[in-house]
């Protein structure tokens, strides 16, 4: 039985995973979690010890994939507002999380990630994680600059001058942009990295 007969689950922080390419539909595969056939499967990052090739959207949405493989779809240390803490001997001492635990679990265990050139980074705004909109270049954002919460600060955070965006930021290029939107105020945020 193929699972994609039912509607795809909704993901609060990644609402259009088919459009962003987080899920692929080019073949029918067996989900490594539920062992059901599916023609919609996850192709983004999944951090775990086991070798996991295919996950269906439903096993991501209900958290069963993260639970079964003790994995995550987003690295805790690569989320704005979440930091690793270390003791005096530089040993890992835990996570400093400024968000409610359930909110962090929703993002890390039940939200499909996205592909970055280096390490994906999830942005936040208004006390909540932002929605991932997609991959962008300068041409995708140049007419929307007034919609950003603070584009200059976003650029500084990923290591580029705001004045260099027009010549550097290219969708699929060496400097790739990742567009996010605040769930509460609707302002845009930008992350980027380099190949």
UniProtKB/Swiss-Prot annotation:
Superkingdom? Bacteria
| Chain ranges passing through the membrane | none
Q: Which GO terms describe its biological process?
A: bacteriocin immunity
InterPro entries, sorted: UPF0167, UPF0167_CbrC
Query: What triggers or suppresses the expression of this protein?
Result: Induced by the two-component regulatory system CreC/CreB.
Task: Please state which protein family the record places this protein in.
Answer: Belongs to the UPF0167 family.
Q: What else is known?
A: Disruption of this gene leads to hypersensibility to nitrofurazone.
What is the recorded name of this protein?
Answer: UPF0167 protein CbrC
Provide the species name. Escherichia coli (strain K12)
């Amino acid at each position: 039985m193929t699972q994609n007969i039912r509607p795809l689950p909704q993901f609060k922080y990644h609402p259009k995973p088919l459009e962003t390419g987080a899920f692929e539909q080019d073949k029918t595969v067996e989900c490594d979690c539920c062992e059901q056939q599916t023609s919609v499967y996850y192709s983004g990052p999944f951090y775990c010890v086991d070798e996991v090739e295919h996950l269906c959207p439903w096993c991501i949405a209900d958290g069963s994939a993260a639970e079964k493989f003790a994995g995550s779809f987003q690295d805790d240390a690569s989320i704005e507002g979440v930091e690793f803490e270390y003791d005096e001997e530089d040993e890992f001492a835990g996570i400093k999380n400024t968000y409610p635990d359930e909110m962090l679990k929703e993002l890390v265990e039940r939200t499909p990630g996205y592909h970055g050139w280096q390490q994906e980074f999830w942005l936040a705004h208004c006390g909540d994680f932002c929605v991932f909109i997609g991959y962008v270049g300068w041409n995708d954002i140049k007419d929307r600059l007034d919609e950003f919460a603070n584009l200059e600060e976003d650029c500084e955070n990923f290591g580029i001058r705001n004045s260099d965006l027009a010549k550097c930021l290219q969708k699929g290029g060496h400097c790739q942009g990742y567009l996010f939107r605040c769930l509460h105020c609707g302002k845009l945020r930008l992350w980027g990295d380099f190949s």
